[in-house]
Amino acid sequence: MYLNFYGLKEKPFNATPDPKFLCLTPGHREALAQLVYSVQENRGFLVLTGEVGTGKTTLLQAFRQRLNGKAVVAYVLDSTLPFEGLLEYMLEELRVPTPASSPAQRLLALRRFMLDRRRAGQTTVLVVDEAQNLDTAALEKIRMLSNFETPTEKLLQILLVGQPELRVKLNRPELRQLQQRIELRCSLPPLSREQVCDYILTRLRIAGAHDLGLFSEQAQTRIAVHSRGIPRRVNILCDHCLVIGYADQRRRIEVDVVDQAIEALEGPAGSRARRFTSPVRATWQRWFVGAVSAAGLTGMYLLALARHVRDLFIR
């Protein structure tokens, strides 16, 4: 929608992680280097934590690339599964034929696979995302997987990835045996104001922007403060700024555009509850969305009309 207007080749602030837009801060680079080194050294149990939106998924994509064929990785996304489901998920990711008879046979099949990979010069890595959702029983059984080893080294490297609640869970007394096996704990901090500004400029550059001053310094500072340094929030806010700037034919994003984007995302201060609890207003909002869709309105006119109706609703 706004690409041609701002001279961009692609959207710079997509919410979906894209390795092409990888922007590693010093904190991200340090965490990535520690993770890769720990896997290469067969450390065993690793933990990575960070708030929602701090770039854990993006970092894991880079982690997988940096291993560069030296490891086979099973990436488990559904941490709500019981251990048997996690094991089946892992075997499927690794393309290990899964005997249907018993969990013991599945474990033996996994061990044979890992030994074969070790003979081929590769290590096996299990990554469990959103690991704060794992219950104590599943965590304890995952710990037991780390018992797979040769006389000289671990066959399986385990990386638990999650939100800060994971750190709290791992400190429970009943998980003390698991605690003792953790060789590395690293976390992703929010971005500083300067890092947010660098992040915005880097993504604009990768997207093909000729004008890297598209966001004024004041606008970047406002985005940094409001996003609290969380990359996902930066992306969402910047994308809304470009949409609103395009609708208003603004070649430069200033603070007032950022404030409009914040209002569009969160509502005016003090009025959010009132807007969302009014059944009449909600009915008109639903009618408006349906009418616009039926009319097939797009682009700048749709945005301008939507913002006008929004302003009517919040008065």
For the regions a language model picked out, list residue spans one by one.
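A short, basic N-terminal segment
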Residues: 1-41, 300-315
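Helix-loop-helix "sensor" segment of P-loop NTPases
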Residues: 96-97, 116-121, 125, 150, ...
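Conserved P-loop NTPase "ATPase switch" module shared by AAA+ and STAND
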Residues: 20, 114-138, 142
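Conserved NTP-binding/hydrolysis module of P-loop NTPases
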Residues: 10-11, 70-72, 81-100
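Walker A/P-loop nucleotide-binding motif
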Residues: 41-62, 79
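C-terminal alpha-helical "lid" subdomain
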Residues: 210, 216-315
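Structural recognition of the conserved hydrophobic beta-strand(s) that form the central parallel beta-sheet
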Residues: 49, 125-129, 157-163
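Conserved alpha-helical scaffold flanking the Walker A/P-loop in AAA+ ATPase domains
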Residues: 34-38, 104-123
